[in-house]
Amino acid sequence: MYLAAYSNQYRKQDVMNASPLRLVIMTYDLAILSCERKDFGKSIKTISALRDALDLDYPEVAVGLFNLYQWCLDCIRKGDYVSATTTLNELRSAWLATEEKILARKVTTISPPPAYSTSFGNILT
């Protein structure tokens, strides 16, 4: 019981201190884990959070991601968690590479990826 409470507090602290880009990656982690566990509800919730957080003011990126998220949601509804997980892993890798490039440049402030707004609600906590 105590360990679970401590872990939850630690996770909340990570979320509070995370950059917008790190929040995107953390949401991917949760979506991938949910798909691997074949947790229908949490898979739908996390992928929907990624989709709903897209900033459509940047349609060049956002529309493509929107369509991929919709496709992943369709896969999950059909029980095809493997295809959804594969796609989410590829997208996560791309965002992680972006984060690594930014950190390598030693940028002190990281702005959110242009395709995302900055709110993910309580999906990560």
Residue ranges of model-derived segments:
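Surface/interface-facing alpha-helical segments and adjacent flexible terminal/loop regions used
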Residues: 1-52, 56-125
